Amino acid sequence: MTMSTFKRIAVTNRSLCSASLKEQVEKICKAGLCNALILREKDLAEQDYMSLAMSIKLICDKHRIDFFCNNMPSVAEKLKCNLQLSYQSFLDQKWKSGQITWVSVHTVEEAINAERLGADGLIAGHIFVTDCKKGLAPRGLEFLKEVCTAVSIPVFAIGGIDDSNSDAVRLAGAQGECRMSWYMRY
């Protein structure tokens, strides 16, 4: 796998931004720092999320960045955009969006099952120590290798990824990496 095919995925968290989220997304998209963006604003009610998603999707579309709604299938359906779901939310889904759906997994068994049930890609983590999962031991590169070997769909690593360990993630077989803090503080 060449560096050009390795996906860089921004995961939002507006509480980490010094500017507005829209300004931050514009900045990272314009700079060409990511190939995809997951709007992960867990504290928003659906209507507020929808409003934010519409404006963030416009920015992503302008810069040809793949846009994913996080755990908001009805918003993804209305906006006709990609969807990223937790494993449990994916299991609970009664319909397939028709859009690209990535699923977060934390075990090899979840990865295999998500692929069997139609996931288009997996987000595996957390791989390294991260402030987002304080007190939880990271699953590590061996876990990532096992997931990548067990499935045939793309696997993207998440959790504590930075410039010092990005190559290790790629060499473990991941087809991309997700970063939150790095993008939100860029």
PLM regions: where:
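Short, well-ordered coil/turn segments that N-cap beta-strands
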Residues: S4-R8, L33-N35, H63-I65, L79-C81, ...
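Alpha-helix-loop-beta-strand connector modules within alpha/beta enzyme cores
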Residues: M50-C69, F90, W95-T107, G135-G160
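Catalytic cores of alpha/beta
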Residues: I28, F67-N82, H106-G118, C148-A157, ...
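N-terminal ligand-binding/catalytic initiation module
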Residues: T2-T5, Y183-R185
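Glycine-rich phosphate-binding active-site loops on the catalytic face of alpha/beta enzymes
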Residues: A10-R14, K42, L85-W95, I123-G135, ...
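Active-site mouth loops of central-metabolism enzymes
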Residues: S4-K22, I100-V105
